[in-house]
């Protein structure tokens, strides 16, 4: 999804939240997120085992719209730091998803190539970001989809078993007409992503 700063910009433009409250809201949101993580996130043997197995064959990176402190809390709580070769948070990039920057930087830092990089994404913006970066995309619906079997089968172009049907805008026969030239500046600034809404 969108980072907090982007969501606040949209609310500011719609005059639903005064701009002067942005800093206070972001601070409070970060405090609550850290509190929830510290209280509820615990070591998960399945997640640990997954990272352990994958790290024996592949380089693992984490790219997130979360802030660095939140990312590090999660890595520490799950005890997966030794399996992660690279991690990047929203504070380390200029352009948030759906811009491909976060994945392009991850690919370069892992000394990989887009075609050799698999991205697991559960958000629409994240999926656009991954595809724009040229990476292979494995869309997921929930944590249940993130299994060693699904990941390795996807890499080998075999059938994977997902917990639910994945919604996708991808369709070779779908044609989208966007009025005016380009993507529509007001549409982009409002925080929308492809496809452009016909009615607001």
Regions inferred by a protein language model and the residue ranges of each:
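Asp-based, Mg2+/Mn2+-dependent phosphohydrolase catalytic module
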Residues: 48, 68, 72-168
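Structural beta-sheet core signal
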Residues: 62, 119, 139, 176-178
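Conserved SAM-binding loop
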Residues: 60-63, 95, 119-120, 199-200
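N-terminal glycine-rich phosphate-binding loop and ensuing alpha1 helix
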Residues: 169-200
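A metal-dependent, Asp-based hydrolase signature
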Residues: 2-35
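A general structural motif
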Residues: 57, 114-116, 171-173
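Short, acidic loop-to-helix structural element flanking the phosphoryl-transfer center
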Residues: 35-62, 68, 72, 145
């Amino acid at each position: 999804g969108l980072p907090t700063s982007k969501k606040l910009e949209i609310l500011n433009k719609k005059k639903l939240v005064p701009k002067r409250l942005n800093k206070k809201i972001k601070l409070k949101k970060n405090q609550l997120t850290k509190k929830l993580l510290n209280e509820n996130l615990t070591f998960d043997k399945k997640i640990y085992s997954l990272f352990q197995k994958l790290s024996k064959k592949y380089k693992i990176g984490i790219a997130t719209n979360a802030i660095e402190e939140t990312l590090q809390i999660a890595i520490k709580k799950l005890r997966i730091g030794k399996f992660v070769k690279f991690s990047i948070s929203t504070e380390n990039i200029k352009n948030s998803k759906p811009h491909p920057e976060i994945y392009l930087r991850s690919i370069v830092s892992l000394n990989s190539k887009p075609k050799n990089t698999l991205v697991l994404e559960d958000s629409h913006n994240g999926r656009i970001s991954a595809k724009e970066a040229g990476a292979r995309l494995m869309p997921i619906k929930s944590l249940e989809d993130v299994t060693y079997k699904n990941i390795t089968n996807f890499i080998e172009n075999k059938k994977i078993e997902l917990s639910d049907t994945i919604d996708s805008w991808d369709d070779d026969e779908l044609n989208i007409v966007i009025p005016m030239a380009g993507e529509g500046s007001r549409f982009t600034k409002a925080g929308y992503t492809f496809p452009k809404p016909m009615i607001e």
